[in-house]
Amino acid sequence: LHQRSVWRNLRNLFMPYKVDLELVLPILKNLRLVDKIHASVGELSGGQQQRTAVGRALFHPGDILIADEPVSAVDEHQAREILKAITGNKPTVVLAMHDRALAIEFADRLIGIKNGLIALDEPASGMKPSDLDDLYKNQSL
C-alpha cells in the first residue's frame, strides 16, 4: 500500500489519474471506506488498510482474483462483508484462508495442501470445519 490516501491507492494502481470517482465510489461504499477516501493509508487501522488493499484488487479489471488471507485483520462481521464483495465481483476467486468456517461458507470448492501435496479437493457444500482437521494435524512449525 502506498502511504497516500485510499482514493490514490485505488486509482493509481491500474489507471493513474484517469479514474473517475464514480468508478471507485461503489467499491468504497461496499468496503465502508467512503469516509476515509482522502485519508493517508498510514492513518488507517490495520483492518481499514486491508479493506483498501481488497478494494484495489476489486478495482483491477479482470475475471480472476487471487488473495492470501484477505480478511485476517478484520472482525468476523467485516470478514463476511469483504468476502461477499470479493465473491460477488469476480467469477473466479482463489483464496488462501485459515478460517475454515468462512472458507466453507464462501467457497464453492475447498482445496487443502499438506506437505506440498493436494490432500483435499472437495465441494464446500456439506462440509464442516472438523472435516478439515486432518490438514492441520502434525504440521511442522
Can you say where each PLM-predicted feature lies in the sequence?
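Conserved ABC ATPase "signature" region
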Residues: 7, 11-36
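Catalytic Walker B motif of ABC-type/P-loop ATPase nucleotide-binding domains
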Residues: 65-68
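H-loop/switch region of ABC-family ATPase nucleotide-binding domains
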Residues: 97-98
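A short, surface-exposed alpha-helical micro-motif characterized by mixed small hydrophobic
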Residues: 103-105
